[in-house]
Amino acid sequence: MGSSRADLLLVNGMVLTLDPDGRRFDPGAVAILNGEIAAVGPAERLAADFRATRTLDVGGCVVLPGLINAHTHAAMTLFRGLADDLPLMEWLQQHIFPAEAKLTEDWVYWGTMLACAEMIRSGTTTFCDMYLFEHKVAEAARAAGMRAVVGEVLYDFPSPHYGPIENGLRFTESLIERWKEDPLIRIAVEPHAPYTCSPSLLTRCNDIALRHRVPLIIHLSENEAEVEQVLSRYGRRPVAHLEEIGLLGPHLVADHCVALDERDLELLGERGVHVVHNPESNMKLASGIAPVPKLLERGVNVALGTDGCASNNNLDLFGEMDTCAKLHKAATLDPTAMPAETVLRMATAGGARALGMGGRIGELSVGRLADLIVVDFRKPHLVPVYNPISHLVYAARSSDVRHAVIHGRLVMEDRRLLTMNVDEVMERVRYIARTIKP
């Protein structure tokens, strides 16, 4: 029995650190103390060195950083399957907007709790949210034990939550102040898109983000219709429009970025903008295919997201990784495009960098926050194992996630959620759904 103390010790699994050197230990171990990783290394050595309050034998499993869903609208679980297979404007105006007009903060809380249950069970430990009543999103994420970056959606027309935009800006700053010391919750400034926000509003949002040193997050160039709308209004494409008013920079997270030309690609790379790729939502809404290989060639950090449940219709990053890798091979007719390791790093370190936590999460290294998942490889569809990263992207399912640890806390053990009564959460959402669609 060693002299070093640990709160939790995971032993005998194959540990994929996903650090820059790609270190792995098999059999390996991870020691956790006070919410951080105290040691990573060979299982025999760590078992001898550490005296742990709790030890989990994860033999036959793979231990890796928790996945990061870098763009979603968590409470839209409430609208999963409400309307599908429709043109975008018809889908929004006839179905989603009328449903959102009924939203209450209580609905958002329970919709987010349902999202957290789904995400934890599918290996996601951090998510980034843009929606309404975001104080309830923060509260739900905190109750579920998830790490989250959240921000109230801001636009020039009245919000179902805060009304006039002045209230929205004040609300955003109050959120920043309320959550600034929290270990799990971080606030971002989140203007909706260039076609719903005036240059003046975008500038004010940028000023708030820079002043508080928090991310600025926006939907950008999601489809060709958006590009045409911004072009006709301002005489510039959306990316060039944001460049003109001073928004492009390493603090900006741009969601989607589907409809890009060569100059757009150059600007995003030159300014250090982070991009979040949402392949399944883009496919389902027929928005197109984001030129992710070209973005990566230009040095753009690309993260992975699911978007909301109304346009995906799940929050499963394992499925998203598989789709991402295969979609770009088909789109480019190049089987070497988007290799498995590139995609896995998008869903881990790429998301961490985009959300301003590149030095804290996204890899298993000493001193990093202890956000990790354990995937059970003792399954017929995961045998034999020549390349575990290949299996994680092309063969594993979200249901293979066995344990989840966030900030050093075991939030799921043997598929059982430890931070909520998931049956109660589902029943609450079923009740809400009867009001949404009687």
Swiss-Prot record:
GO terms for molecular function: 5'-methylthioadenosine deaminase activity; metal ion binding; S-adenosylhomocysteine deaminase activity. It comes from the Bacteria. Zn(2+) binds at H71, H73, H219, D307. The keyword Cell membrane does not apply. Its cofactor is Zn(2+). SUPFAM superfamilies: Composite domain of metallo-dependent hydrolases (SSF51338), Metallo-dependent hydrolases (SSF51556). Its EC number is 3.5.4.28, 3.5.4.31. Keywords: Hydrolase, Metal-binding, Zinc. It holds the Pfam family Amidohydro_1. Binds 1 zinc ion per subunit. The keyword Nuclease does not apply. It catalyses: S-adenosyl-L-homocysteine + H2O + H(+) = S-inosyl-L-homocysteine + NH4(+); S-methyl-5'-thioadenosine + H2O + H(+) = S-methyl-5'-thioinosine + NH4(+). Substrate binds at E100, H192, E222, D307. InterPro entries: Amidohydro-rel, Deaminase_MtaD/DadD, Metal-dep_hydrolase_composite, Metal_Hydrolase, MTA/SAH_deaminase. Catalyzes the deamination of 5-methylthioadenosine and S-adenosyl-L-homocysteine into 5-methylthioinosine and S-inosyl-L-homocysteine, respectively. Is also able to deaminate adenosine. Belongs to the metallo-dependent hydrolases superfamily. MTA/SAH deaminase family. This is 5-methylthioadenosine/S-adenosylhomocysteine deaminase. The lineage of its organism: Bacteria, Pseudomonadati, Thermodesulfobacteriota, Syntrophobacteria, Syntrophobacterales.
